[in-house]
A protein has these predicted regions:
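Start-of-repeat signature of ankyrin repeats
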Residues: 5, 39-40, 73, 106, ...
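Conserved ankyrin/ankyrin-like repeat signature
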Residues: 20, 54-55, 87-88, 120-121, ...
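Ankyrin-repeat inter-repeat connecting loop/turn
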Residues: 31-33, 66, 99, 132-134, ...
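Ankyrin repeat boundary/linker residues
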Residues: 35-37, 70, 103, 136-138, ...
Length: 335
């Protein structure tokens, strides 16, 4: 009987029917019951997600647990924060909601607000004691600032920094907020982070820099910004790979051209002796290969096993690349 009443309660919540909610509660529905058909959400979570302040108030007054968690570890405050329901979030905190609670992935309400760009919610949470430097320690080790940088939420990023967020904090893989912004091409945030002291030379666990992330993703404007601020165009990761190699491998022609114009070494080799041209050859990036050859890349350079760019093209079945290297090689030799 109680289970049936709980179902009636959940349906009344979905319908936002106050009278039906009260009737279900008066008949014995469990106000803190979990809806097993929807990740174990409680009545308060439904109301908080919907932003229905009146129902939230009603549920709390009747004993709803403000810190209950669903099967994913989400609280009512997390639902309100994610969906930008400021009045509900304010009430929940007033009634004792934990602003630093984390879900099963270690994500907090502030992180959710940062992802979604919910500035007023983020401001409220910080004012009420949310830790701006908390990390989602169960997964990536990312901070709210990293989430904001990745999502392109400049106002949130600015707020977090003003409130003491560490601009050079690293996640479990050693990635910084600047690397996240660079990878996603969020120019304004990258500029903000640098202005606030972000280390453009920082490397992650694999030795990748913000510039390498920008190059790999083809984010020309961010790459240009980083270089203008002093980023080393020839910096190498732990495998000896440069930004130009990453750009060449993924066919990011404009970034490759930018890097070369800013001094990237077309002859640089990684730990295996492979060059940017070899990377372009393996992945069949014709335009990038043509650019590299035009800029002086040695088509006869060999890696540690004696492989040349054309041998890589043959090995990976890139017949058009074989043709291009032969044709371009002859042309530039004649010049």
């Amino acid at each position: 009987m109680e289970t049936d009443l709980n179902k009636v309660l959940f349906q009344a919540l979905k319908d936002e029917d106050k009278r039906a909610i009260m009737e279900a509660l008066q008949k014995g529905a469990d106000i803190n019951a979990k809806d097993n058909d929807n990740d174990g959400m409680t009545a308060l979570m439904y109301a908080s997600e919907d932003g229905n302040l009146g129902i939230v108030d009603l549920l709390i007054a009747n004993g709803a647990d403000v810190n209950a968690k669903d099967n994913n570890g989400w609280t009512a405050l997390m639902f309100a924060s994610f969906d930008d329901n400021l009045e509900v979030a304010t009430l929940l905190i007033k009634e004792g909601a934990d602003v630093n609670a984390k879900d099963n992935d270690g994500v907090s309400a502030l992180m959710l607000a940062s992802i979604e760009g919910n500035l007023d919610i983020a401001t409220l949470l910080i004012k009420e004691g949310a830790d701006v430097n908390a990390k989602d320690t169960f997964t990536y080790g990312k901070t709210s600032l990293m989430y904001a940088a990745e999502s392109g939420e400049k106002e949130i990023a600015n707020l977090l920094i003003k409130e003491g967020a560490y601009v050079n904090a690293k996640d479990k893989d050693g990635k910084t907020s600047l690397m996240y912004a660079s990878e996603k091409g969020n120019l304004d945030i990258a500029d903000l982070l640098i202005a606030q002291g972000a280390n453009i030379h920082a490397k992650d666990r694999d030795g990748k820099t913000a510039l390498i992330y920008a190059a790999e993703s083809g984010e020309k404007e961010v790459a240009n910004l980083l270089i203008s601020k002093g980023a080393d165009v020839n910096a190498k990761d732990i495998d000896g790979r440069t930004a130009l190699m990453y750009a060449s491998e993924s066919g990011k022609l404009e970034v490759a051209n930018l890097l070369i114009s800013k001094g990237a070494n077309v002859h640089a080799k990684d730990k295996n002796g492979e060059t940017a041209l070899m990377y372009a050859s393996k992945f069949g990036e014709l335009d990038t290969a043509a650019l590299l050859i035009k800029k002086g890349a040695d088509i006869n350079a060999k890696d540690n096993l004696g492989f040349t760019a054309i041998k890589f093209a043959l090995l990976f079945g890139k017949q058009d690349m074989v043709k291009l290297i032969i044709e371009k090689g002859k042309l530039y030799l004649l010049q």
